[in-house]
């Protein structure tokens, strides 16, 4: 198979496939006499794994580890499960951080009258300025 065939079958662009090759994330393809890359089913499997792992949040380094596990006949499913659960925990931490940010933004929005006044508690809060609050207290 050539690179365009692999791109169609994996849903990756030719550029992405070359990038993964340059990063050493997939087994290097053989070269035909004319210098074109020749891919096998193994390459399809590795590239599909990379695409799907990226879609669920694994970074490039983690994807490389998953490809190595894929190619290791002595791998243990416990290793794959451990990495997957670590990724879940990381995503849960990120979700928690995002929810906290959302709560802070909503609290700021609720404190703002949203009228034609130049005074804005949101700007005051974000800038650390208490000018707005000091005027209200007087």
UniProtKB/Swiss-Prot annotation:
Residue ranges occupied by any HTH merR-type domain in the UniProt entry: 1-69
A GO BP entry: positive regulation of DNA-templated transcription
InterPro entries named among the record's database cross-references: CueR, DNA-bd_dom_put_sf, MerR-type_HTH_dom, MerR_fam
Record flagged with keyword NADP: no
Location of the protein in the cell: Cytoplasm
Main location: cytoplasm
GO molecular function, one term: copper ion binding
Function comment: Regulates the transcription of the copA and cueO genes. It detects cytoplasmic copper stress and activates transcription in response to increasing copper concentrations.
Descriptive protein name: HTH-type transcriptional regulator CueR
Gene: cueR
